From Swiss-Prot:
The lineage of its organism: Eukaryota, Metazoa, Chordata, Craniata, Vertebrata. May contain several disulfide bonds. This is Hemextin B. One of its GO terms (cellular component) is extracellular region. Its main location: secreted.
């Protein structure tokens, strides 16, 4: 996921299927890999 980018995670994830999820994970500073697994 593009969420890995800490610059503008919300904006990048905005075009994805799980924008809110990516946003929350970024706030928690948790890599998407953990949740995806």
């Amino acid at each position: 996921l593009k969420c890995k980018n800490k610059v503008v995670p919300f904006l990048k994830c905005k075009n994805k299927v799980v924008p809110f999820l990516c946003y929350k994970m970024t706030l928690k500073k948790v890599t998407p890999k953990i949740k995806r697994g």
